[in-house]
Structures are given as C-alpha cells and as structure tokens.
Amino acid sequence: MASGLGSSLVLLVVICLQSPQGFNAFPQMSLSNLFTNAVIRAQHLHQMVADTYRDYERTYIPEDQRFSNKHSYSVYCYSETIPAPTDKDNTHQKSDIDLLRFSLTLLQSWMTPIQIVNRVFGNNQVFGNIDRVYDRLRDLDEGLHILIRELDDGNVRNYGVLTFTYDKFDVNLRSEEGRAKNYGLLSCFKKDMHKVETYLKVMKCRRFVESNCTF
C-alpha cells in the first residue's frame, strides 16, 4: 500500500512539473500535496539556478579569482535588507504566513532581472535554460499564492509588500567588471532560492509531522 501511494505521489509531481498550467492543473489538491508540489518545484528551481551559476563560473570566472569574487560581490545581497530569517532557529520561530510572504518577496525580486536576462542572453550557452528558470519562478510564485489562500481562509491580501528588485545583469560579458557583477547576482539568486526551498521544507515538515525538521 505504501509503495503504491509513493508511486502515485511521484507520478503527480512529474505531471505537475510537465504541465504548462502548473498548480492550476490540480485545483482540488490537498494541502499536503500542495506543499509537496511546492517543495519539489523549489528544489528544482534552486538546482537550475545552481547549475547556471556553476556554468557561468566555469565559463567566465578564472579559477584564481573565484573565491575573491564570491567574497567581494556576494557577501551582501539585497535580500539581506528584509527581515527574512537566515538561520534555522529564526526560521522555526516564524509563522507559515510569514515564511510564505518572505518567499514571495524573494521570488518577485528576481522576476524582472531574469526576464531581461532571458531576452538578452536567450541564445547564450551558459544561460540556455534561463527561460525555464523564469517560467519556474512564475509558476512557484503562483503556487505560493494558492498556499496563502489555503492557509488564510481564502483571503487574498498583498503579502508581497516588501517590494524590491535586484539590479539588471550586465549585458557586456567582455567587461571584467560586468562579468563580476553578473557573478555576484547569480550568487545572490542561488542563495535566495535556497532560502525559499528551506522555508517551504520547514513549513511542510512541521505541518505534517515529518521525522526531522532540521535543514
């Protein structure tokens, strides 16, 4: 029975990931499945961003400069200006609505920069999957709004009130300064998507009493 249930859940997630309608393809999903779907989508998005970051680093950043660039360009990200938790203790102290609100803020802060990257670098080998990254951003954003409505008795409020956006990526990849700026932005993007993934895992774990809620 457990094996059959697990297979069904995996099939559901695969269908959702492939469906162009995203979360709306399954409007009657249980809350548990909505969280499962959101977590897997966040994991997938985080991995895609991490792969893009890795490919960019290998292509444009000399090995002897990589650690220095990480420290000088990605130590500070705009997301650090919002009161989103940065460690597991603070994360567990936040309500689910707060964590969803922070997640929405992080997702929405990248919408415009990634949309521009998609237009400018769509044919670039390193940024070849950036169109899918943008689609995943929008889809997960939609899914988090659905979760908020489920948790807040159907109310639709402006939870993305902590509005900010990142700088545009530099289109001049021949410029060392431009390459370094993009490297720092990708580092922040990866860091922010890891936060979103972690917040969703914590919410799912504590709501459905999974064995280990430390991430």
Swiss-Prot record:
Subcellular location: Secreted
Single Gene Ontology BP annotation: growth hormone receptor signaling pathway
Transmembrane segments: none
Disulfides per UniProt: C77-C188, C205-C213
Keywords of the record: Disulfide bond, Hormone, Metal-binding, Secreted, Signal, Zinc
UniProt: Zn(2+) binding residues: H44, E197
Principal location: secreted
Top-level taxon in the UniProt lineage: Eukaryota
Signal peptide: 1-25
Cellular component aspect of the GO annotation: extracellular space
SUPFAM superfamilies linked: 4-helical cytokines
Single GO MF descriptor: growth hormone receptor binding
Family assignment from sequence similarity: Belongs to the somatotropin/prolactin family.
Protein's job: Growth hormone plays an important role in growth control.
Protein name (record): Somatotropin
